[in-house]
């Protein structure tokens, strides 16, 4: 908490710790506020561990803006412990995706859990986000809704790009 109050840990990376603590203690699903769910699909909510997987990236296993887990999930506990150890020792953020890199290490440690998880790419869930700065196209919108029922709408990089466009 001290490093967060001193602004050494920013809001984004503090929320990584918060999401892990809540999921480890209570289980359930963490959904960032920037996510739109257009259709309920039980497979995303009723698993011991679920997150959208990253395609063609050996360093980042998947996204952390939507995670379902059981209580005391070992992958999340390992990720949390590694993050606390990192922040105990460090005064600066070495990589924006530190959560994802440590998450990748943790899931490799428990690879059998990862292999049992439903395989959903994080690419289709970003389609809508990429269209937000363009003129509305109903055909494309229908296509996107058919491709995914969960949509990640914003991220920090997108917000800065959008701000630049409207300036």
Feature map (PLM): residue ranges:
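Small-residue hinge/turn detector
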Residues: 17-28
């Amino acid at each position: 908490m001290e490093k967060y109050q001193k602004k050494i840990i920013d809001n984004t990376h503090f929320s990584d710790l918060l999401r892990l603590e809540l999921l480890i203690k209570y289980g359930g699903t963490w959904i960032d506020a920037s996510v739109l769910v257009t259709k309920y699909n039980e497979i995303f909510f009723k698993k011991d561990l679920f997150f959208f997987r990253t395609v063609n990236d050996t360093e980042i296993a998947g996204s952390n803006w939507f995670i379902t887990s059981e209580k005391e999930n070992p992958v999340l506990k390992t990720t949390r412990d590694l993050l606390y150890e990192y922040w105990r020792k460090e005064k600066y953020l070495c990589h924006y995706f530190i959560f994802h890199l440590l998450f990748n290490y943790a899931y490799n440690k428990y690879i059998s859990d990862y292999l049992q998880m439903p395989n959903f790419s994080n690419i289709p869930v970003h389609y809508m986000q990429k269209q937000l700065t363009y003129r509305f196209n109903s055909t494309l919108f229908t296509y996107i809704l058919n491709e995914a029922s969960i949509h990640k709408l914003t991220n920090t990089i997108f917000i800065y790009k959008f701000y630049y466009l409207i300036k």
